[in-house]
C-alpha cells in the first residue's frame, strides 16, 4: 500500500460547498469524532492509539460506536499512513489508511472505492473523519486486512535464491487481471500505479486483491491527465513520452512488467531515471518505429532515437520457460497501447489453462480461491471469449447462467 513516487499534482474535483465534509460523513452514515490518543504504545505516533467513530443511524438502524486500536504501521508515503488496527468490539483486524483531507475538495479515492466491489479488489468497510488539536482534518479509510504483498512474497523467493513456482505466478497474475478487468469495465477506473507492492496476497487462500487507489481515476476520452503517474519500473512508455490522453492500457503494461518480474525474479526494466527507464525498455523491445512513437505521443515522431534491435523474448527468460508465458508477456508489453490485449483477454490466455482444469488445486491440496465468479465485466464480452473464460465443468455445475457462476 505504498504511495506513488514523489509529490504529485492531484487532479481534484470541483470544490463542493463548505459544508461538504460534514455532509460526506453524514451520507456515509458516519459522524466525525476527534482522534482520541491513548498513550499505551511506545514513542510511536500511532501504536496504541484508539480511534472511535459512530456508524449506523440510517433507515431506523441504531447508532453504535466502533473503536479501533492501532497496532502497527504497514505503509507510509506522501499520501499519509496505513496502519493495521483491531476493532475493540469485534476483535476483527483491519487496515486503516489515514490521509490529510483538504476541506475544499472531495476525496477521489473514497468516491472510487465506494463504487467498487469485486473479489480481487480491496474492500472498503467504511470511512470516517477525525481531527487533531491543530484542527487538521483526516479521512480514515477502513479496509479489509490482507497480510502479504506480492512484493514481499517475491522477495521471500529471491532471498532463498528460488524462482516463484509457476502455479503461483499463474494464480496471482490471473487474479490481478481479473481485478483489472473489473475496474476497467464496470466503474471504468484506471488504477495508474499497478506494481507488486499494490497487489495483496492472502498466504492461506492465495486470493489476490488490488489495493491503493490513491492514484486511480476514471479516464474520460479527450480529457487530459497527468503523465507523471505510476512507479518507474512499471511505467508505460507513453507516460515516459509525456502522453496526457492515455487509456487503461497503461495498467496492462504495468501488469506485464509484474508478470515478467515474477518469472525472472527481478524487475524487467530497472531504470534509474525516467530517461534510463526508456533505455531499458528499448534494450528489450528495440527502438520504437515512427508509427509506434505516434501511437504513444505524436509530438515525438521527429526525435532521432538510436537504432537498437529487439532482444528475442525467449532469450530474456530461461530455457525452460513455457512458451505460453513468453507469448503472454509479449502481448502485454507492446509499444502501441491499442495493441496490448485487454485484461479480460489476458485472463483467457492459454498460460492460465491449468487454472481451468477440473481437478486443479493448490500445491497443498486445498481448492483455489474463487476464479470464475465473473459479474458485470462479462457484459460486453463475445460468446467466444466467455467460452474461453468459463471452463466446461463450471458451466455444467451452474447451468446456463454461467456469467454469474462461482468457482
From Swiss-Prot:
InterPro entries: GSK-3, Kinase-like_dom_sf, Prot_kinase_dom, Protein_kinase_ATP_BS, Ser/Thr_kinase_AS, STKc_GSK3. Highly expressed in the entire young panicles, spikelets, awns, vascular bundles of palea and lemma, stigma and rachilla. Expressed in root tips, root hairs, lamina joint in the collar region, vascular bundles of coleoptiles. Belongs to the protein kinase superfamily. CMGC Ser/Thr protein kinase family. GSK-3 subfamily. The active site is at 193 (proton acceptor). It catalyses: L-seryl-[protein] + ATP = O-phospho-L-seryl-[protein] + ADP + H(+); L-threonyl-[protein] + ATP = O-phospho-L-threonyl-[protein] + ADP + H(+). It is an enzyme of class 2 (transferase). Induction: Induced by cold and salt stresses. Down-regulated by drought stress. Residues 68-352 form the Protein kinase domain. Keywords: ATP-binding, Brassinosteroid signaling pathway, Kinase, Nucleotide-binding, Serine/threonine-protein kinase, Stress response, Transferase. Its EC number is 2.7.11.1. This is Shaggy-related protein kinase GSK1. Residues 1-19 have a biased composition (Pro residues). SMART domains: S_TKc. One of its GO terms (cellular component) is nucleus. Residues 1-21 are annotated as: Disordered. GO terms for molecular function: ATP binding; protein serine kinase activity; protein serine/threonine kinase activity. The keyword Lipoprotein does not apply. Probable serine-threonine kinase that may act as a negative regulator of brassinosteroid (BR) signaling during flower development. May have physiological roles in stress signal-transduction pathways. Phosphorylates LIC in response to BR perception. It comes from the Eukaryota. Interacts with LIC. The keyword Nucleotide-binding applies. Disruption phenotype: Increased length of spikelet awns and weight of seeds. Increased sensitivity to brassinolide. Enhanced tolerance to drought, salt, cold and heat stresses. ATP binds at residues 74-82, 97. Pfam families: Pkinase. One of its GO terms (biological process) is brassinosteroid mediated signaling pathway.
